[in-house]
């Protein structure tokens, strides 16, 4: 079994690849080569967002990757995201009409007539949040998004949708790794048929966002504690990244590693030649620190 053949159910008739290629912090001009290289390594899910400011480059990479592999569009799963606005940053929330227009703009930049999953990137829409969600449901009905979901939503945000009598999201993309396990949210999502997609799976790595100026809430204590994962990875004969990604897929979460190195791209796909044993899974369950670590400004789901 390999990652290209493994997927998790998203809707009754749509599955999401277990391992996708994340494109956050990949520059527009680097995206074509990165995405096409990832596809040549075997990735069949590409994750991007309007907020990443690289959709044009990602779209070019998709076209190159499909052509090089002799694949058609339906062989690839593409996720895009609406930036909902954020009043705290002086960015007015998108209205329902603006949400529809934003999706059209993303599709144009990507050079696609539809995406496989379209997400509201964060719950920052305030009183426009439900209008944004209704717009996503319209996009699904129109065939511009095969499935729709949210990102960084907590139980309260999801209950808002439920209380409005609207269909629940197909997926919620959230920060998930041994230091931020969100058991109550994950259980709620399972109860309501919302697929979990994990981002920032590699937070515990010493190299994760280690460059000066890269945003995170990672402390020196956390950096010191990361050695436990290197010891555990050595036990299985895998990299720390593979161990952390395997933790995600073993829990049923689609994961989204990013690398510009072809060797590591392939390595991050190789998650099904080993399994973390029950004792280590139990040990990792004790490492939960609660809120996310990915953002210095705090967990966006709060």
Language-model segments: residues:
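Active-site mouth loops of central-metabolism enzymes
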Residues: 17-29, 82-97
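A short, structured active-site edge motif that brings together acidic residues
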Residues: 72-87, 118, 123, 152, ...
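Short, acidic/polar
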Residues: 26-39, 92-110, 156-159
